[in-house]
Amino acid sequence: RRRQRQMCIRDSNSIGQVLLARRMGKRRIIAETGAGQHGVATATVCALMNMECIVYMGKTDVERQRVNVEKMKMLGATVVPVTSGNMTLKDATNEAIRDWCCHPSDTYYVIGSTVGPHPYPDMVARLQSVISEEIRKQLLEHEGRECPDYLIACVGGGSNAAGTIYHYVNDPHVQIVLAEAGGKGIETGMTAATIALGKMGIIHGSRTYVIQNEDGQIEEPYSISAGLDYPGIGPMHANLAKQKRAIVLAVNDDEAIRAAYELTRLEGIIPALESAHALGALEKMKFKPTDVVVLTVSGRGDKDIETYLSDE
């Protein structure tokens, strides 16, 4: 039967992990979410499989992503607002991990990005690799080749970027461009530009770049985008940046908003704020007329309409 899809790129990750949880005999599913997309995807799968679903979400994000919160509730999930710290994605992840540690026998934690302890970063990247599989198929159909010249994706934790580049990482002819959240500007302190400002550290079980102070304490990140508002980065992306395999650009809030409006007016596509950062990277790049450029628009902008209108 055809079912209306509640989500897009997040589905494959949630489906894979919930199926794994069921195989392991777990009855209770927990997840964290920032923009709410991963929460909706996980709640959808749990509804289909008749499994309990608890989603942790920072109180700040609950308020700015009300549409997705209501979707999760309609799907039968319990949404737990997190009031610690900056009340955003990092804090939601903290609470989800605490829950997981307290209920190891019956609970499975569906992590939404390429973060957390092994094997989560690798597992999420593999499940999201359907994105690059689809890119290869569409390029072959429309361009007569499987490889683009450039791949562009936004990065917070990095799940959609990992899926976008998965089958191209070892191809030196494909230039990878990662757009992270510059916030109000990387020099202002109100930013989530982890690769630009971060130092090597540990966050949620991963060794990666982390925004931290001189004492090693994790700093509170900021981004207009709830899904990119994270002080770490997936270890895969940290390594790509360290090895100079990827170009990393910090895209500020206003640049992302401007790029989102441009896409909407030119193509009739309203992108999520997360994807708008990838679009904002376009004006920072120079391409040849013959270059084939693939940019992943990883989510719809329905959830961000109020933010777009208030920042127009």
Q: Where do the model's predicted regions map?
A:
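Phosphate/pyrophosphate-binding loops at sites that engage ATP/ADP/AMP, CoA/4′-phosphopantetheine
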Residues: 137-146
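Residues forming the flavin
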Residues: 27, 46, 51-53, 171-194, ...
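Active-site-proximal loop->helix
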Residues: 19, 30, 38-96, 187-198, ...
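Claisen-condensing/thiolase-fold acyl-transfer catalytic domains that form or cleave C-C bonds
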Residues: 155-159, 163, 253-312
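A short, small-residue-rich loop immediately preceding and capping a beta-strand
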Residues: 21-58, 146-160, 176-179, 292-297
